[in-house]
């Protein structure tokens, strides 16, 4: 088993989140990297310890990079001594490691995350100096108190983390060579294909749909439904991390445009008339923006890590 120590604000939510991540074998709340080897909850603002979760994981099931991508999903990495409504040095963010070999991956992830922000990261990156296991009543707090305070959305643990660095965007020159003129017009020039005459509007085989420009996974067949609009429709992306949103006021309408995270491809729009039992959203997506990978080809094409997220 491997381990990493993660400070991300109030440890109740961080512990609960990581306890739900496949491949994590244990998550224990405690206090790390303060002054001295002893402390308790009432004293951590004096002893300088940070509320921290000791995450133990099976490296055969989940990598350190994936653990860190989960971590950065749930924190504000530019906020110093504050996460959610919690303020104080005990709520600072930090990644504390016990194996120097992990530092290469940690540095890589920090560098990738830093590029997304104008402000410097406020996340500590240090050897673990000390760790004090928190009092019993803090352990599994949200399991024992399901309506207890939590500053993060622990339900996001159900979604896969998708490593953006695996799917770099080709140059415009390369895209013009690899995409058809119609695919280029839709993804790069914000055009829209015709309804009911596109390749995926009535396709419901098991598999995933990836960005036609980069190959980044975007949608799963398990979230696809027949909406009657004539375009592929989904209740949600395969992960909330892989799409971005932009207000679109073209054609004298106000709509919410959906774009891919890495490729910045125009995908379509999201509307609020989807199935109510699935959240009420309808992602109306151009077939020309995506490529379908059948379930039986996912392993061959490098998407085996998403097989559990396909029906």
Curated annotation (Swiss-Prot):
Sorted UniProt keywords: Multifunctional enzyme, Oxidoreductase
This protein's record includes keyword Transferase: no
EC numbers on record: 1.8.4.11, 1.8.4.12
PROSITE patterns on file: MSRB (PS51790)
GO cellular component: cytoplasm
GO terms for biological process, alphabetical: protein modification process; protein repair; response to oxidative stress
EC main group: oxidoreductase
Domain MsrB: 172-295
Molecular function terms from GO: L-methionine:thioredoxin-disulfide S-oxidoreductase activity; peptide-methionine (R)-S-oxide reductase activity; peptide-methionine (S)-S-oxide reductase activity
A family per Pfam: PMSR
Residue span of region Peptide methionine sulfoxide reductase A: 1-155
Catalytic-site annotation from UniProt: 10, 284 (nucleophile)
Chemical reaction(s) catalysed: L-methionyl-[protein] + [thioredoxin]-disulfide + H2O = L-methionyl-(S)-S-oxide-[protein] + [thioredoxin]-dithiol; [thioredoxin]-disulfide + L-methionine + H2O = L-methionine (S)-S-oxide + [thioredoxin]-dithiol; L-methionyl-[protein] + [thioredoxin]-disulfide + H2O = L-methionyl-(R)-S-oxide-[protein] + [thioredoxin]-dithiol
Regions annotated as coiled coil: none
Family indicated by similarity: In the N-terminal section; belongs to the MsrA Met sulfoxide reductase family. In the C-terminal section; belongs to the MsrB Met sulfoxide reductase family.
Function: Has an important function as a repair enzyme for proteins that have been inactivated by oxidation. Catalyzes the reversible oxidation-reduction of methionine sulfoxide in proteins to methionine.
Protein name: Peptide methionine sulfoxide reductase MsrA/MsrB 2
UniProt organism field: Streptococcus pneumoniae serotype 4 (strain ATCC BAA-334 / TIGR4)
Gene coding for it: msrAB2
């Amino acid at each position: 088993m491997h381990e990493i120590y993660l400070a991300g604000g109030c440890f109740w939510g961080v512990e609960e989140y990581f306890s739900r991540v496949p491949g994590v074998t244990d998550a224990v709340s405690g206090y790390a990297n303060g002054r001295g080897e002893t402390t308790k909850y009432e004293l951590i603002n004096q002893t300088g310890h940070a509320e921290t979760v000791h995450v133990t994981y099976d490296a055969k099931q989940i990598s350190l990079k994936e653990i860190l991508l989960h971590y950065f999903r749930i924190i504000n990495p530019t906020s110093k001594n504050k996460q959610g409504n919690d303020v104080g040095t005990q709520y600072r963010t930090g990644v504390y490691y016990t194996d120097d070999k992990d530092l290469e991956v940690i540095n890589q992830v920090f560098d990738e995350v830093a590029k997304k922000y104008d402000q410097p990261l406020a996340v500590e990156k240090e050897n673990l100096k000390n760790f004090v296991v928190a009092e019993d009543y803090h352990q599994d707090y949200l399991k024992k108190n399901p309506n207890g305070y939590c500053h993060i959305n622990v339900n996001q643990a159900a979604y896969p983390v998708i490593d953006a660095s695996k799917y770099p965007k080709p140059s415009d020159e390369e895209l013009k060579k690899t995409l058809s003129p119609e695919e280029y017009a839709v993804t790069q020039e914000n055009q829209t294909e015709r309804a009911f005459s596109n390749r995926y509007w009535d396709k419901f085989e098991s598999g995933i749909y990836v960005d036609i420009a980069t190959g980044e996974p975007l949608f799963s067949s398990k979230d696809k439904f027949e909406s009657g609009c004539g375009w592929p429709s989904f209740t949600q992306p395969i992960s909330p991390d892989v799409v971005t949103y932009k207000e679109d006021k073209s054609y004298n309408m106000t709509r919410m445009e959906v774009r891919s995270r890495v490729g910045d491809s125009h995908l379509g729009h999201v509307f609020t008339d989807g199935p109510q039992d699935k959240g009420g959203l309808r992602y109306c997506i151009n077939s020309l923006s995506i490529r379908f990978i059948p379930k039986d080809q996912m392993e061959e094409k490098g998407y085996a890590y998403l097989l559990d997220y396909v029906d």
